[in-house]
Swiss-Prot record:
It comes from Photorhabdus laumondii subsp. laumondii (strain DSM 15139 / CIP 105565 / TT01). Its EC number is 1.1.1.38. It is an enzyme of class 1 (oxidoreductase). Coiled coil: none annotated. Keywords: Metal-binding, NAD, Oxidoreductase. One of its GO terms (biological process) is malate metabolic process. The active site is at residues 104, 175. GO terms for cellular component: cytosol. This is NAD-dependent malic enzyme. Belongs to the malic enzymes family. A divalent metal cation binds at residues 246-247, 270. The gene is maeA. Its cofactor is Mg(2+); Mn(2+).
Length: 565
C-alpha cells in the first residue's frame, strides 16, 4: 500500500497552457481534469469532454488499426510517443505482443533507413563530431535531468542493414521504449543518443534530405578520442548512469566494451545481451530434452563479436556444469565467410583466437579443401545446435538442415539474424526439412508453423527478455558495473521461466505478454549477483523487492498541482 500511495502523490509542475500540452512526459491531452484545466490555463485548448486514459487508448488503437502497413503504424506510434508518452506506454501495455515488432525489430529497420524522410520531431541527443568541443554543453541541453539509462549508437551496423548514419537513432529510441514497456523504467530516466561521426553509405551522403553530418566516417585515433570525450562527459553529467552500446561495427564494438566496462556501468547488447538471451534459451532447450548444455555440440555461422560473445557465454555455462575450458571449447565450432576458424587461419581477431579448432583434431575429417564449409562442419562435427548470426539470408540450406537431422533426433536451430529479410532460414522450412523434429528460435518474430495438423510455436530469441531486467536490476541495486556474473544470472533466470523446460510443453520462451514479470525476476537475480560480486550495496531480499517495485513505472496519469518558476 505504501508503494501505491507513493505513485499517487500529486506532481507539482510549473508549466501551463500550450507549453504543457507540448511536453510529452507531462501531457495528458483530453484527460486533464476540470480542475487541472482551470489551474493550468488549458480551457479552450482542449475539447470539452474529460476522458480516461482507457478511452484515449481505445481511440488510439482504432486509429492504429486504420493503417495497413507496418511502417505507417510505426510512424503513428512514434507520433503518440512524441506527444503523450503515458498514453503511448498504456497502449503498448495493452497490445505489447502486437506492437513490439512495430516499435522495434523488424519494422524499426525500415524506419532507420528512412529516418530523414519520416523525421517529425527531435528526440534524444545528436552528438556530432563537428561539435566535439561542446559535448558537455549538449548533455546539459538534454530535457531530462535525472537520466539513469542511455542507449548510444554510432549508426554503423544497424541490425543487418549496415551503415545508416544518424538514421541509427531509431534503434536507441526503440530500445528505450522496451526498457520502459518491458522493464518498467520510467521514460523520464531514459535518453537515446546517436554519435554522428559521418557515414560511408553513399545513399545517405548523396541524399539531399539527409540530416546528419555529410562526411565520410572518422576512424582510428580520431574516432576513439571522440567516443572517449563523450564517455567522460557522460560520467561528469550522470556518474551513476547505465550506458548501453548499441549497433557499433565489429571493429569498434568489442574494443569499446573492453575499454569502458570497468570504468563506467555499461554493456553491449549486441554482444552480451544477445549472448545472454541465447544462452538462456539453450539452457532451457537442453533441459526440455533431458540434457545439460555441456552435452551439446554447437556450430555457429557468423564469427563476429556477437557470435563469439554467445560462444564465450556457452563455454562459461559448460564449465559451470563440469567441463574444463579445453573440453568446452572443443564442442564449439565457429564458421565465417572463410570457413571454419582453425589455428591455421591468419589474421584472426583477438576475440576469435580463443575459439579456433585445433587442426590436429580435424585430421580425420572428410573434407575436400583447406576451407572447411558449414556443410563440412555439420557432416563431421555432427552438431546438435546450429546458431546463425551471419546477417545473410538463406545460408541454412535444406541440405545443411537435413544433414544435421541425420545424426540429431531433435536439432536446435537458431537463425538469429535481423531483420526478417536477413534470417538464415525460415522456421517453416526448418520444420518441414526435419519432419517437425527441430526446436526453432529466431531473432525476429515469426508466426507459429503448422505442419501435419500440428502447430509449432517459434520462440523469438529477443534481447528484450534480458536487457530491461538488467536495467531494472542495476537501477534497483545501484550497481556500479555490469559483470559477467550478472549477465549469467539473467540467462539462468530466463531459462527458469521457460514453459517448455519447466512444464514439458508450450513455447521455449515465455509469452511476450508475461515479459514484465520475467523482467522483475531477472532484475532481482541480477541485483543479488551485483551484491555478491561487490558492485552493489548488500541489502535484504525484502528491501530489494521493494526497490524493484518502487522503480517499476506504470503508465498512469498523476494528479497535477500548480507551482511557479
Amino acid at each position: 500500500m505504501e508503494l501505491e500511495h507513493e505513485s499517487k502523490r500529486p506532481l507539482y509542475i510549473p508549466y501551463s497552457g500550450p507549453i504543457l500540452l507540448e511536453f510529452p512526459l507531462l501531457n495528458k491531452g483530453s484527460a486533464f481534469t476540470e480542475e487541472e484545466r482551470r489551474n493550468f490555463n488549458l480551457h479552450g485548448l482542449l475539447p470539452e469532454a474529460v476522458e480516461t486514459i482507457e478511452e484515449q487508448a481505445e481511440r488510439a488503437y482504432r486509429q492504429y488499426l486504420d493503417f495497413k502497413n507496418d511502417a505507417d503504424k510505426h510512424i503513428y506510434l512514434r507520433n503518440i510517443q512524441d506527444t503523450n508518452e503515458t498514453l503511448f506506454y498504456r497502449l503498448l501495455d495493452a497490445h505489447l505482443n502486437e506492437m513490439m515488432p512495430i516499435i522495434y525489430t523488424p519494422t524499426v529497420g525500415e524506419a532507420c533507413e528512412h529516418f530523414s524522410d519520416i523525421y517529425r520531431r527531435a528526440r534524444g541527443l545528436f552528438i556530432s563530431h563537428p561539435n566535439k568541443a561542446h559535448i558537455d554543453d549538449m548533455l546539459q541541453n538534454a530535457t531530462k535531468q535525472n537520466v539513469k539509462v542511455i542507449v548510444v549508437t554510432d549508426g554503423e551496423r544497424i541490425l543487418g542493414l549496415g551503415d545508416q548514419g544518424i538514421g541509427g537513432m531509431g534503434i536507441p529510441i526503440g530500445k528505450l521504449s522496451l526498457y520502459t514497456s518491458c522493464g518498467g523504467i520510467s521514460p523520464a530516466y531514459t535518453l537515446p543518443v546517436v554519435l554522428d561521426v559521418g557515414t560511408n553509405n553513399p545513399q545517405r551522403l548523396n541524399d539531399p534530405l539527409y540530416m546528419g553530418w555529410r562526411h565520410p566516417r572518422i576512424t582510428g585515433k580520431e574516432y576513439d578520442e571522440f567516443v572517449d570525450e563523450f564517455i567522460q562527459a557522460v560520467k561528469r553529467r550522470w556518474p551513476n548512469v547505465l550506458l548501453q552500446f548499441e549497433d557499433f561495427a565489429q571493429k569498434n564494438a568489442m574494443p569499446l566494451l573492453n575499454r569502458y566496462r570497468h570504468e563506467i556501468c555499461c554493456f553491449n547488447d549486441d554482444i552480451q545481451g544477445t549472448a545472454a538471451v541465447t544462452l538462456g534459451s539453450l539452457i532451457a532447450a537442453s533441459r526440455a530434452a533431458g540434457r545439460q548444455l555441456k552435452d551439446q555440440t554447437v556450430t555457429f555461422l557468423g564469427a563476429g563479436s556477437a557470435g563469439c560473445g554467445i560462444a564465450e557465454q556457452i563455454v562459461a555455462q559448460m564449465k559451470s556444469e563440469g567441463l574444463s575450458d579445453e573440453q568446452a571449447r572443443a564442442r564449439i565450432f565457429m564458421v565465417d565467410r572463410f570457413g571454419l576458424l582453425t589455428d591455421k587461419l591468419p589474421n584472426l581477431l583477438d576475440f576469435q583466437n580463443k575459439l579456433v579448432q585445433k587442426s590436429s583434431s580435424l585430421a580425420k575429417w572428410d573434407v575436400n579443401n583447406d576451407s572447411i564449409s558449414l556443410l563440412d562442419v555439420v557432416r563431421n562435427a555432427k552438431p546438435t545446435v546450429l546458431i546463425g548470426v551471419s546477417g545473410q539470408a538463406g545460408l541454412f540450406t535444406e541440405e545443411i538442415i537435413r544433414e544435421m537431422h541425420k545424426h540429431c533426433e531433435r536439432p536446435i536451430v537458431m537463425p538469429l539474424s535481423n531483420p526478417t529479410s536477413r534470417v538464415e532460414a525460415r522456421p517453416e522450412d526448418i520444420i518441414n526439412w526435419t519432419d517437425g523434429a527441430a526446436l526453432v528460435a529466431t531473432g525476429s518474430p515469426f508466426n507459429p508453423v503448422k505442419y501435419k495438423d500440428q502447430e509449432y510455436p517459434i520462440a523469438q530469441c529477443n534481447n528484450a527478455y534480458i536487457f530491461p531486467g538488467i536495467g531494472l536490476g542495476v537501477i534497483a541495486s545501484g550497481a556500479k558495473l555490469v559483470t559477467d556474473g550478472m549477465l549469467m544470472a539473467a540467462s539462468r533466470t530466463l531459462a527458469n521461466c521457460s514453459p517448455l523446460a519447466q512444464e514439458g510443453q508450450g513455447p521455449l520462451l515465455p509469452l511476450i505478454d508475461d515479459i514484465q514479470e520475467v523482467s522483475r525476476k531477472i532484475a532481482k537475480q541480477v541485483a543479488k549477483e551485483a551484491q555478491i560480486q561487490g558492485v552493489a550495496t548488500v541489502t535484504s531480499d525484502g528491501a530489494l523487492d521493494e526497490a524493484i517495485e518502487r522503480n517499476f513505472w506504470k503508465p498512469e496519469y498523476r494528479v497535477y498541482k500548480r507551482t511557479s518558476f
